[in-house]
Amino acid sequence: MRPLRIGVSTYSFWHFKGEPVDIAHCIDRAAEMGFDGVEILHQQMGGEDNAYLQDLKRRAFTQGLDLMGFSTHQGFVSPDKAVRQKNIDHTLRCIDIAWRLGIPTLRVNTGRWNTIKSFDELMANKGIEPRLEGYADDEGFKWIIDSLEQCIPRARECGVTMGLENHWGLGRTAEGVMRIVDAIDSPWLRVTLDTGNFLEDMYEQMQRLAPHAVLVQAKTYFGGGEWYSLEIDYDRVNKILRDAKFRGYVSLEFEGKEDAATGVPKSLAVLRHTLAG
């Protein structure tokens, strides 16, 4: 079996601190470091106009890189229908952007209750937060399912598969992610598996999601993690992915405090070694 292809998220070069690192610069660095592709973080982009998008696509192509993932944020867990509609509209726009960039998959999130406002505090609490008073998780799941169902026709039209990530909120666990994916039951909504977002029973939960994954995000923490560090056995992750017959891209999300100039190449070396076959 061929080695898995390895890309890098532009998030690896910018952890939401200071001015966003230019996407074009990230593409150039990815090529220099020897990656196969690039996953673009939407919040890091310098614009959405077509000239900007096509320049990024041209740049990646001339560097021999695939633009293989588009990482976006959603917040469907709200009793306010207007808030949910705003997030639906945002997702539809992001599907269009991915299509214009030639990117085949879009990372989507469930959103969360937002009863803990600070992300740092949320991470200190292991991603767990109280429900909004007067509401139950069942209602939150219904909002997410109803919202993502409205995005399926656009995803199908554009040929962009949404990948629901295990990314806090009601998608914090494999059970929560699969509750949504199974309910919608569409080939245009699958899973983005993040190896660093399961803080309990990580390998068992990865096994649950791996057969449904269209993209895997691989966390590393050289220099210590920005919020926490996990000891992830990537030989074991590789076996999970192989057993699930996963053949897609693995996207590095370097989340360590070490400078990206050294932390990212170190991470690539680990992934090249462990995911070789």
Could you describe each region identified by the protein language model?
Residues 20-24, 44-53, 85-86:
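Aromatic- and glycine-enriched glycan-recognition loops and surfaces
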Residues 54, 59-66, 78-190:
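Active-site acidic/histidine proton-transfer and metal-coordination neighborhood
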Residues 1-34, 102-105, 145, 149, ...:
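Histidine-acidic metal/acid-base catalytic patches
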Residues 75-80, 114-117, 200, 222-226:
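A short acidic, helix-capping loop that chelates divalent metal ions and anchors anionic groups
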Residues 39, 69-71, 107, 163, ...:
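Conserved beta-strand positions in the central sheet of alpha/beta enzyme cores
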Residues 36-45:
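A short beta-strand-loop structural module common to alpha/beta enzyme folds
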Residues 44-45, 74, 112-113, 169-170, ...:
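Conserved beta-strand edge residues that scaffold enzyme active sites
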